[in-house]
UniProtKB/Swiss-Prot annotation:
Designated name of the protein: Putative protein phosphatase 2C-like protein 45
GO molecular function, one term: protein serine/threonine phosphatase activity
Family membership: Belongs to the PP2C family.
Pfam families: PP2C
PPM-type phosphatase domain location: 1-188
Length: 245
C-alpha cells in the first residue's frame, strides 16, 4: 500500500484557507510518506517566509497532487501521474499528467520535482474537486468521474461524499485496476443543509472549517484498507444532529 493523503484546514486559524494532497509512492512507501507528512506544512511555512528542505530516501519516489484553498482562490499543483479534476457546472476540467515526481534520486537528470501549477478563482459554477491517484485515472475518465460523483455531491438534503468516493474506487477496481487507489473529494460551492427544519446555505469558506476531506485507499487485491470520512457540512452536521437525538 503506497498511496498516502494529507489535509490541513483552518490555516493559521483562518477558516477560508485549507490545503489537501494525494501522494503515490513507487519503489517504496517512504517516498510517499515523506511529502504526505511534510509537504503541505512546508508550503504553509514557505508562504510565511520560512524554508525547510525535505529529506527523502534516495531510493524510490512519489508523484503527488495538492490543492490549496485560500480566500476564494484555488491553487492546484501536480507532479507525476496523480490528477485533479474539477466539476464546473457538470463539465470536467482536469489537470495535466506531467512527467515529474518527488525523490527518484537516480533519475534527477530526467525527472524534476517542480510541479505544474494552476491558479484560479473559485466561481459559482465550480462545484467540487476530485484529487486521485493514477489507480483511478487509469480506468476512469475525467468526465466519467464527474458524472458519477456529481449526484452524490449536489444532493440538497446531505452530500454523500464518502459514497461517491467508494463508487469511483469500486468502478476502477471492477475494471481491473490492481494498483493502489486513493480518491479525495473537496466541495467548492455553497451547500444547502437542513438544520432543525430550516434550510441554510453554508459557503465553501465555512465548509473548509467543517468539511475536511474524504479519501479511500484500497489494497492491490481490491479490499478496502482504510478510509477517512470527514465529508461535507451536510455529512457532519447530520451526524451531530443524530448524536443529539
Amino acid at each position: 500500500m503506497e498511496d498516502r493523503f494529507s489535509t490541513i484546514t483552518n490555516l493559521h486559524g483562518d477558516r477560508k484557507q485549507a490545503i489537501f494532497g494525494v501522494y503515490v509512492g513507487h519503489g517504496g512507501v517512504k517516498a510517499a510518506e515523506c511529502p504526505a507528512k511534510n509537504l503541505d506544512k512546508n508550503i504553509v511555512e514557505e508562504v510565511v517566509g520560512k524554508r525547510h528542505e525535505l529529506e527523502i530516501a534516495e531510493a524510490g519516489g512519489s508523484s503527488c497532487v495538492t490543492a490549496l484553498v485560500s480566500e476564494g482562490s484555488l491553487v492546484v499543483s501536480n507532479a507525476g501521474d496523480c490528477r485533479a479534476v474539477m466539476s464546473v457546472g457538470g463539465v470536467a476540467k482536469g489537470s495535466l499528467v506531467v512527467p515529474r515526481g518527488i525523490g527518484d534520486a537516480q533519475l534527477k537528470k530526467w525527472v524534476i520535482a517542480e510541479p505544474e501549477t494552476k491558479i484560479s478563482r473559485v466561481e459559482h459554477d465550480h462545484e467540487f474537486l476530485i484529487l486521485a491517484s493514477h489507480g483511478l485515472w487509469d480506468k476512469v475518465s475525467n468526465q466519467e468521474a464527474v458524472d458519477i460523483a456529481r449526484p452524490f455531491c449536489l444532493r440538497t438534503e446531505k452530500p454523500l461524499l464518502l459514497a461517491a468516493c467508494k463508487k469511483l474506487v469500486d468502478l476502477s477496481a471492477s475494471r481491473g485496476s490492481f494498483d493502489d487507489i486513493s480518491v479525495m473529494l473537496i466541495p467548492l460551492r455553497p451547500v444547502r443543509i437542513e438544520k432543525r427544519g430550516i434550510l441554510e446555505d453554508v459557503s465553501s469558506s465555512k465548509a473548509n472549517s467543517i468539511a475536511r476531506d474524504i479519501a479511500i485507499s484500497v489494497t492491490r487485491d481490491g479490499r478496502f484498507r482504510s478510509y477517512l470520512a470527514r465529508g461535507g457540512p451536510g455529512w457532519l452536521l447530520s451526524r451531530i444532529e443524530e448524536d443529539k437525538r
